[in-house]
Amino acid sequence: MEALFLSSSSSSIVASNKLTRLHNHCVWSTVIRDKKRFGPTWCRVGGGGDGGRNSNAERPIRVSSLLKDRGQVLIREQSSPAMDAETLVLSPNGNGRTIEINGVKTLMPFSGASMVGMKEGLGIISFLQGKKFLITGSTGFLAKVLIEKVLRMAPDVSKIYLLIKAKSKEAAIERLKNEVLDAELFNTLKETHGASYMSFMLTKLIPVTGNICDSNIGLQADSAEEIAKEVDVIINSAANTTFNERYDVALDINTRGPGNLMGFAKKCKKLKLFLQVSTAYVNGQRQGRIMEKPFSMGDCIATENFLEGNRKALDVDREMKLALEAARKGTQNQDEAQKMKDLGLERARSYGWQDTYVFTKAMGEMMINSTRGDVPVVIIRPSVIESTYKDPFPGWMEGNRMMDPIVLCYGKGQLTGFLVDPKGVLDVVPADMVVNATLAAIAKHGMAMSDPEPEINVYQIASSAINPLVFEDLAELLYNHYKTSPCMDSKGDPIMVRLMKLFNSVDDFSDHLWRDAQERSGLMSGMSSVDSKMMQKLKFICKKSVEQAKHLATIYEPYTFYGGRFDNSNTQRLMENMSEDEKREFGFDVGSINWTDYITNVHIPGLRRHVLKGRA
């Protein structure tokens, strides 16, 4: 890009023939006159302003027209700018009076790190420098990867406030140390900072007690005031990810929580961006190619293909009241808890979502969109997040993610088949790629100048449309791994597995489970020497084993037979805006993933090391 020459005065107003868009109609520029650099400024094509939201924002220079002419003054109305310009005609005060200055011959590029479209790309690191973040869900898997990446790549970030559910400040600090700072994920930072690691981390990471389920997100008055004055970016990573959670519990954190956090965000004076970590599966039972579009309040997937007059609107407030009333009427015993779980599944499926988790997350997006006002919003929708691909090292994982119970049970010989469409696709993305895309989106939209009507930007971080992992291929990869690197039983003997059988029929799967359980228990061999009491015990064990496997399959069925493919065009364009250096350090090209290498050499070894702790 050649530089755009601008000045807020009525002189030195000459433009190059290329303009770089930063956000909507904003363009970055610099003033260079008589070989002196006057620094970057910006303008809004056709006028603008900051909409009154940020009184400290730099006032935009209103562009009356951009035109190409070398010999005469041409004036265009503000409504029809010509974007191919060597001469820039400005109306500095937006009053229709135009000024043209030409004759500047030498155009020099501005080398600032934050200019979009130039060699510096999005300027991710420069944006992070000196910024203050508020992150919820900070003790969770993805948030830890995000925190580690920020502190490793931009150690001069100012502060990261971590909203932690705890009874006291001391308890919050204890959770931070035990659940975050002691994690193996941070080993690279430990090596970098050595003995000063803990002091560095506690200087940057500020735990604050709170809960997004509460009003004002549960903050004490002094903490709320401090954060509202200082924070630049809010990241909501808090969620309940249990597919069949109690309806009231899931609504509280996944739907009401984002609304509470947005209410707090609107009090933040310097806020540049609100980022919601959602899931691609908020698209529910949609089929085919699913675009990166935000939800509006009342959207209902079950009826969205009907004629407009026949649509049934989803009333989020009514759903929250329904769950609250049901919880009040019930008791805390196991039967009532199951009823609340069943209620969530029933409500989700009636509106076109497969389970309580994705239904309540979708309603959380609706809450954000309907209450955001002039707060800029980015929604990140990853698919199934699994172990790190590369950073800070390959294979880091915490807890059993979506497909991991199946992977581990298969390796231990406890599961020899599963209910799945063999030709179907498991949409998987490594955690570090999700984090990289998140930081790229933050830099892109966090640097955008204030817009009176900021858009809500959606990025789906998913692999199914551009690099699908087919279930029958996954089964073969699992078999190849465990064939060469088997798990060990309690006696230290290798557990030999067979290629997993895939069933697209519930009846066939059930028959297989029962035969397999009997075979593994020895019931099929007759066992004439076993007394009747032992026989009954073995039959009971077989029955429980079959029930557990069928329960697991029932929960996963909407995903193992999922008919949608997540479009990621916005995400691809975001990546195209990055410099080559940024692509190396913050890459998220899911199309480049070699699934054979990732599954067999990265993900499963990571599971066995970090989840099983080497026990298998």
Curated annotation (Swiss-Prot):
UniProt tissue specificity: Expressed in the tapetum of anthers.
Extent of the signal sequence: none
pH dependence per the UniProt record: Optimum pH is 6.
Primary localization class, coarse: plastid
Gene Ontology MF terms in the entry: alcohol-forming long-chain fatty acyl-CoA reductase activity; alcohol-forming very long-chain fatty acyl-CoA reductase activity; oxidoreductase activity, acting on the CH-CH group of donors, NAD or NADP as acceptor
Span of chain positions assigned to the transit peptide in the UniProt entry: 1-14
Gene Ontology cellular-component terms listed: chloroplast
Thermal properties of activity per the entry: Optimum temperature is 30 degrees Celsius.
Subcellular location field: Plastid, Chloroplast
Database matches in CDD domains: FAR-N_SDR_e, FAR_C
Alphabetically ordered keywords of this record: Chloroplast, Lipid biosynthesis, Lipid metabolism, NADP, Oxidoreductase, Plastid, Transit peptide
Motif NAD(P)H-binding: positions: 133-143
Keyword Lipid biosynthesis assigned: yes
Residues the record marks as active site: 357, 361
Entry function: Catalyzes the reduction of fatty acyl-CoA and -ACP (acyl carrier protein) substrates to fatty alcohols. Triggers the accumulation of C16 and C18 fatty alcohols; converts palmitoyl-acyl carrier protein to the corresponding C16:0 alcohol with NAD(P)H as electron donor, but seems inactive toward palmitoyl- or other acyl-coenzyme A. Also triggers the formation of some C16:0 aldehydes. Involved in the synthesis of the lipid component in sporopollenin. Required for exine patterning of pollen grain by mediating the formation of pollen wall substances.
Name of the protein in its database record: Fatty acyl-CoA reductase 2, chloroplastic
Organism expressing this protein natively: Arabidopsis thaliana (Mouse-ear cress)
